[in-house]
Amino acid sequence: MPLQNRVTPSGDIIATPHRGLFTGNRGIIHDPATKTLTRRWANKAWLTCVCEFRGRRRQVMARRSWTELFFLDEATAFAAGHRPCFFCRRDDANRFCAAWDAGNGTTKVFARDIDPVLHRERLEGGKKRLHPLPMRWEQLPDGAMVQAGAESFLIVGGRALVWSAAGYREARSEIVDAMLLTPPSIVRAFGAGYRPVLHPSARSVPSPLVAGLSGENIRES
């Protein structure tokens, strides 16, 4: 049975057999005896890490060790309110800080400055905080995520792709009353040039135009 350690864009932690591209943590939030969660977070530093680092192997949910969480991709981690780790992802973390400065009007921002901002932007009353869209969802930078009803959507090239633990798929219906899932400060960093790593399925979903042309070609043949 899979452990409850996979994070959704809304920040919930679920159990699923699907694997993700990134790991990360929110401190120690598990009981090592039962390998079950005891809380949703232990500190304000919510990190996104690489799954492999210098050949080190970790026992998942071990004693006296941070709780390993997993994400479909970096866009999912950002939507939940995590940021790149400075230990295992230093180059990415530095690029993110530079984009944060450019997008949010700060100068030489540090992790200790970012963490309390993200904590306010990702939570409201202990639950995931949703924000009004700063622009039409089609105009959001690649990697931003929105929520509409029960579905989470990744925005790529002005298109909305439905998130699932297995990957992304084309949205089949119109998106109505969408709210911003990704913390606004992170969206501004995206707008300033940071490019989050996306799951391969985000790039493999054909556009409606391409799909339509393919259908026409099949009928004509």
Label every model-predicted segment.
Residues M1-S221:
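Mature, structured domains enriched in cysteine- and short glycine motifs
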